[in-house]
Amino acid sequence: MGEKRGVMFSDGKVWFEQRRFSIRNLKVLGWGGQTMEQMILEDAQNFTKFIERKCKNGNINNMKTFTSLAVLNSLWSIIKGSRYDLESGDPKVMKTLETMNRAVKNSNVTGGILNHLPFLRHVAPKFSGYDELNERLNKTWIFFADEVTRHKDSWQPGIRRDFIDVYLEEIEARKNDPTSTFNEMQLVALLKDFFAAGIDTTSNSIEFTIGYMTVCPDIQDKVQAELDKVIGKDNLPSLAFRNSLPYLNAVLKEVLRISNIGPTTIPHRATVDSTFMGYEIKKNYTVLPNLMSVHMDKEHWGDPEAFRPERFIDEHGEFVNDPWLIPFGSGRRKCLGETLAKNTHFLFVVCLLQKFRFKLPNGQAPPSMLGKDGFTMSAPEFDIVVTPR
């Protein structure tokens, strides 16, 4: 068994120390605060302007890479101290995003056939997809390792430009501790975790939302009427408006429920023998909480296959949460980036629906909104006509 790295696929001391360090220092650098909100809003506005220029050239089909880059900027400015332009983009970053998007689409959270029949990587590495997946993961690892190397070359103790600098400082402080879990390999793994988990799920949330607004124009009308009344078409949105937008909140929650972007959590490992609800779970068993089964439970939701935001609206027209909605998991292993994901989803969707009307091309029947299976569920791709409001 190899060294446990990062926070997504580790447990025990490694997971506890790496997660605690990450949360504490990301908050110091602006994570979850007003600074982060301002960065997200700037990225959302830039993305809106980009879409406005893009839609002049015709229908928009796949916004995946551009949405991912726009969502990446807020997080990446804290992680490595720089941002990227949507128009030109950084070729290496764009290539890494494309590589990771393909890896996510071509695998699933259990590891697919390789997880159930691991010997296939030796007897049929090409047929099983092991060669292709391994190549993409290696390219992604090299991208982040190179970023750490560039930071080391210009790093000065005591000067904290970003998260990478803070982590390098921690490595230096613990270099004489043989039990330390802080090293460059761990840093690269953390960066990959932040990049993969935060970017893919959030960009998919935005794309699913725009997709549902496109195929459900009556719901789009209601959301835009609420936005016009509460914020206006030309005023800057902010998180302070969130509690005054019950219908939009209901729509965003319903998107997360029905799209099941993370159909399960990431794999967990049982660290001790235990019994749960009569089931015996042995030490080292892999446990996958099935979030989709909760979100699509017919007894609880009644009509889980229907996109119906009103299930989150009470008789007084107010938004009500439902404890059965757990897209970020629950407990101590809950998603590290939940706050960032929710804030980004909200501000991006508000900016887009303030400025644009989304509809299907004339004569096109509404497509299925069933997601594409992979490590996460990806929004379906279809032509969308985007017009300024």
Positions of PLM-derived features:
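C-terminal helix/juxtamembrane-tail motif
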Residues: 165-169, 286, 357, 374-389
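Conserved cytochrome P450 K-helix E-x-x-R motif and the immediately C-terminal K′/meander segment
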Residues: 142, 236-278, 298
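Conserved cytochrome P450 K-helix/beta-meander segment immediately N-terminal to the heme-binding cysteine loop
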Residues: 289-317
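Conserved, non-catalytic sequence blocks in retroelement Pol enzymes and Pol-derived host proteins
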Residues: 9-13, 28-36, 61, 87, ...
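Short, small-residue alpha-helix embedded
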Residues: 202-213, 348
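Cytochrome P450 heme-thiolate monooxygenase catalytic core
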Residues: 13-14, 33-206, 222
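Cytochrome P450 heme-binding "Cys pocket" and the immediately downstream C-terminal segment
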Residues: 217-219, 287, 339-377
